[in-house]
């Protein structure tokens, strides 16, 4: 498996790393089977979060006996010092470990710093001094916050969305991390399911000093990435042309499915409904036109234009308008 150095952490992780958000949706035994198969076939880095319901618990169940052979990162979305320590204690308990390799602030709206009044970064330092965490990281979807974190010198890793749909500013962020020796952990490498050719995604990311974490829920998905261990895809003219075609279709105002607009006070499944037009055209067999799918989309009519989703969107999308456009397009598929 190809490897990458995570900046000044000096941790060496595989270009195939495990994103454990999707294992929330499967049983403990199914998750354990996937996690162990990944480890047995060369995965050494596993990423989760306190917000991912029982993901940490499943990871601890599956990997506790090989703890010293793997790298674990998790996250806290706490906004208070009390919440920080509560999250950390719970994560350590669920993961069945006494330390976390990389502890990350989970998509904060600002860049926590020393002396900012929140006490959050001071708590990180204290946790590190106590040996409960080894490296300090941050995850974000906002370019300005990410850039500030990298330039601050306070963070050893940055986790940020990066795929072959990346803008020039996103690519510049990768270079900024390299200049500051900050490890770049790449999330949303398949753009929330909109990218369906993982070989092209892998080949594109292999050009950069980034560590992709692939969200894996099914064994066939894992097998697909494992096939790249011995035969890693690389960029060629055909893949470059395919990426250019994809960029023309997917660049611009589209929902990435990050879910930071959720929950909706009216019960609208925003992070699915707001990108339904693309899902219908890119995964037509996924049952989007079922009775359940139609009922989900019909909830868009209940939108009261409160603006909460628009204010929360890290990509600055006009979410209410995007929902309405997607619903109008959806109706054309029902005729």
What does each model-identified segment do?
Residues 1-70:
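N-terminal binding-site loop/beta-alpha segment at the start of enzyme catalytic domains
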Residues 39, 43-44, 172-186, 190-335:
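Structured C-terminal cap/extension of enzyme domains
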Residues 69-72, 155-163, 233-239:
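Short hydrophobic/aromatic-enriched beta-strand-loop microsegments
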